[in-house]
Swiss-Prot record:
Positions marked as site (Cleavage): 31-32
UniProt-annotated site: Important for catalytic activity, residues: 283
Pfam families on file: Exo_endo_phos
CC cofactor note: Probably binds two magnesium or manganese ions per subunit.
Active site, per annotation: 171, 210
Catalysed conversion reaction: Exonucleolytic cleavage in the 3'- to 5'-direction to yield nucleoside 5'-phosphates
Protein name in UniProt: DNA repair nuclease/redox regulator APEX1
Enzyme class label: hydrolase
Length: 318
């Protein structure tokens, strides 16, 4: 339910899972709670140097970036485009754009190299959800949604087919505060899995975006305290595992860095979570098995600011 502020203004709950602070009983109790949440001190993630060659020694030929921008217009005001220009991806995928296509900021025209731009947003909800895909090369084909009316009303999926692979960028529905959309999320997961399996049967698949789940305990800072919260319920984690097995797909980051902890892509704005690195890994590049020989690196750009998520980058040698 929306919450009301002091003057009666409606404040919408955010879509991302949040770790709520516990009530303070005393100064000593507050310090204890903080230590339990973040440990004795913040442990930050250091992104290692980019690996730009595949296991066979082939140089990377494709760079894809994905970023949940938490509002396209606000992200641009926070200099998000400056990071994009410096990173210089061949393909840029954006989630939670919260912007209809007829209201896109003019600043996007500055991305002259990413001239092929595709957008999807809800037809009846301005300022909600939405995804974008910007590409240097013109895709062979572009489509929107997963082909089921129940799941294609909120602008959550763009599919772009290229010569060597199909790219899907997605903003997966959040189960919501109090898990009010968990049942819907489970229906989505089943339909999305079926859709991706069909795509992957015809051409190698790259799936990227905010998939709104921390798969394993290593993928969030406070697993014990979030097992009943959106993004880490047993149902969502099981659905993600079934996606990996059924399509099948491989988590590119965990494939390369199986034991790397404190690597997160989302931090709530509350309680200085980002500076303390109390986060979640919700953003992924998932790859078909046949793409793995081309995998050079899968990066988490945790120092890039502009949203409550950070961008992620994939290098492929195709």
């Amino acid at each position: 339910m929306p919450k009301r502020g002091k003057k009666g203004a409606v404040v919408e709950d955010a879509e991302e899972p949040k770790t709520e602070p516990e009530a303070k009983k005393s100064k000593a109790g507050a310090k204890k709670n903080e230590k339990e949440a973040v440990g004795e001190g913040a442990v930050l993630y250091e992104d290692p140097p980019d690996q730009k060659t595949s296991p066979s020694g082939k140089s990377a030929t494709l760079k894809i970036c994905s970023w949940n921008v938490d509002g396209l217009r606000a992200w641009i005001k926070k200099k998000g485009l400056d990071w994009v220009k410096e990173e210089a991806p061949d393909i840029l995928c954006l989630q939670e754009t919260k912007c209809s296509e007829n209201k896109l900021p003019v600043e996007l025209q500055e991305l002259s190299g990413l001239s092929h731009q595709y957008w999807s947003a809800p037809s009846d909800k301005e300022g909600y959800s939405g995804v974008g895909l910007l590409s240097r090369q013109c895709p062979l084909k572009v489509s929107y949604g997963i082909g089921e009316e129940e799941h294609d009303q909120e602008g959550r999926v763009i599919v772009a087919e290229y010569d060597a692979f199909v790219l899907v960028t997605a903003y997966v529905p959040n189960a919501g505060r109090g898990l009010v959309r968990l049942e819907y999320r489970q229906r989505w997961d089943e339909a999305f899995r079926k859709f991706l399996k069909g795509l992957a049967s015809r051409k190698p698949l790259v799936l990227c975006g905010d998939l709104n789940v921390a798969h394993e305990e290593i993928d969030l800072r406070n697993p014990k305290g979030n097992k009943k919260n959106a993004g880490f319920t047993p149902q969502e984690r099981q659905g993600f595992g079934e996606l990996l097995q059924a399509v099948p797909l491989t988590d590119s980051f965990r494939h390369l860095y199986p034991n790397t902890a404190y690597a997160y892509t989302f931090w709530t704005y509350m309680m200085n979570a980002r500076s303390k690195n109390v986060g979640w890994r919700l953003d992924y590049f998932l790859l078909s098995q046949s793409v793995l020989p081309a995998l050079c690196d899968s990066k988490i750009r945790s120092k890039a600011l502009g949203s409550d998520h950070c961008p992620i980058t994939l290098y492929l040698a195709l």
